[in-house]
Structure formats: C-alpha cells, structure tokens
Amino acid sequence: MRFIHALLLAGIAHSAYASEKLTFKTDLEKLEREKAAQIGVAIVDPQGEIVAGHRMAQRFAMCSTFKFPLAALVFERIDSGTERGDRKLSYGPDMIVEWSPATERFLASGHMTVLEAAQAAVQLSDNGATNLLLREIGGPAAMTQYFRKIGDSVSRLDRKEPEMNDNTPGDLRDTTTPIAMARTVAKVLYGGALTSTSTHTIERWLIGNQTGDATLRAGFPKDWVVGEKTGTCANGGRNDIGFFKAQERDYAVAVYTTAPKLSAVERDELVASVGQVITQLILSTDK
C-alpha cells in the first residue's frame, strides 16, 4: 500500500512539474508574439543538466556576453602561471573604441593591468579593455579554442569589438546557443574550470556588474543572489547570462533575445519579463 501511495505522489509531482514547464513555454511564446521577438532561454543546474529552456539550440549573437568567458580564460591563464594579474598592458589611443570608459580613464597612464582590464570588460562591458585582452590571448580564435577546451562545441568568436555586434540574420559568426552558453557558465562557476580563488573573484564581479540592473536582475526576487553579464547587439539583440541562487539551489542561466521593433528600454524590459517567467518556474518547482 505504501508503495502504491509513493507511486501516486511521484506521479502527482511529475504531473505538476510538467504543467509548470508547459506554463513556462506558453508564457515565453506569449512574450514572443506580443513583442515580435525571438527568445532563447536555457537554465541548467551546476552539473549542466537542463532545468528548463526555450529555443535552446537556436543560434543567437553573443554580443558582450562573451566577455564573461573571456574573463574566465584570463583567470585560467593566471591560475596556470602563464599570466600575471598585475602585469601592465600598454596601449595607445587606437585602443579606444565605442564604449570604453575604463580604457579612456587609464589612457593617460598608457596602461591597465590584466585584472583591471578583465574587471572592466565584465562589470562595465568596456570594449577597449576587451580588445586589449583579446590582443594578449591571441585574438578571437583563441577565445573559440577556449570554448572548445571547456566542452563548448558551439560558441564561436570571429571578430573583436565592435564589429562582432553586427548581428546579421543568418551569420554564424560570433554566435552561441542558450544551452551551450548556460553550460559554459556552469562549467566555469561550478565545474572546476578555475581555482576557487579565481572562481570567487569572477562571481563577485558578476554580482557587482554595473550594466544589468534593468535586465534579468530586475525580474528576479530581491533575496536571490544574482550575478550576470549583459550583451547588446545591432538588430535588436539584448542578452543576459550568469547565475542565480534560489532557495539554496544554484543555477546557471542564459537568455538571448532578438526584438528589432523594440526600443532599448523595451528590450531591457523584455529580458526582465523573461526573468519573471523564470522566477515563476523556479518557485513553483522548488516547493
């Protein structure tokens, strides 16, 4: 009798979970219709197992979300002893491109340290600092090699900033899929890709990111621990990737959207709305 009772409870729980995932999908499809948008979402656990998703295998332009795995690559080099965080990277005015606030600020001194550039790339989305790091690691191809090294066979970087933000429909360059990037986030933060010290530092940077207050973070409950890296592209691209801790459970998340008919503010609101849909799913399945 107890066995039958247990089976019934398991069946009810499975049915409820399936219902919540259907609601998740339905809510995202509704947002897509209302906003004339395409929305890609992947949520995975620390082992990279899928929790939920939508358009998970569809390619989207990475935009500046790649700056998080770029920073991870920099930390890997530091961890292995092939790089020093305090090494000064010299540069001149030619390194100043659109949206380079920290690079401009340090220009008078003629250099930034490796860690200063990495932090600026993550927390400010500084394009000059990003290109400076790309110069040091060996260019976009080296970034793609790092993706492959940590098990991501999909994500690719082909150009530097700002050219990589073209987001031309059908162009495979500088793209990823939500599931590939979510698993990359999980690998970096939970999979032992970095030392504990480097992992802690990059988590702290993501939590202190200064470009994401209006995106996923705005759609999540205030008591969740959230760290993320945003991205913005031409043709309506607005993205956010990172991690969150909800009810003592850790998750990696990747959200990629294309909404060319929306304003910049409306695209932020769209990503925040996706955050609300994710919240509803997580709270309902963690009961």
Swiss-Prot record:
GO terms for molecular function: beta-lactamase activity. Disulfide bonds join 63-233. Inhibited by the beta-lactamase-blocking agents clavulanic acid, sulbactam and tazobactam. Its EC number is 3.5.2.6. Pfam families: Beta-lactamase2. The keyword Cytoplasm does not apply. A beta-lactam binds at residues 67, 125, 161. It is an enzyme of class 3 (hydrolase). Residues 1-18 form the signal peptide. It catalyses: a beta-lactam + H2O = a substituted beta-amino acid. The active site is at 64 (nucleophile). Keywords: Antibiotic resistance, Disulfide bond, Hydrolase, Signal. Induction: Expression may be regulated by promoter elements associated with upstream probable integrase gene Intl. One of its GO terms (biological process) is beta-lactam antibiotic catabolic process. The keyword Signal applies. Belongs to the class-A beta-lactamase family. The class A beta-lactamase family has a specific amino-acid numbering system, sometimes called Ambler or ABL numbering and often misspelt as Amber. A multiple sequence alignment was used to derive a consensus sequence and then the consensus was numbered taking into account insertions and deletions. This allows use of identical numbers, e.g. for active site residues, despite differences in protein length. UniProt always uses natural numbering of residues, hence there appear to be differences in numbering between this entry and some papers. Extended-spectrum beta-lactamase (ESBL) which confers resistance to penicillins, as well as first, third and fourth-generation cephalosporins. Has modest carbapenem-hydrolyzing activity. Has cefotaxime-hydrolyzing activity. PANTHER family: BETA-LACTAMASE (PTHR35333), BETA-LACTAMASE-TYPE TRANSPEPTIDASE FOLD CONTAINING PROTEIN (PTHR35333:SF3). NCBIfam families: bla_class_A (NF033103), blaGES (NF012103). This is Beta-lactamase GES-2. It comes from Pseudomonas aeruginosa.
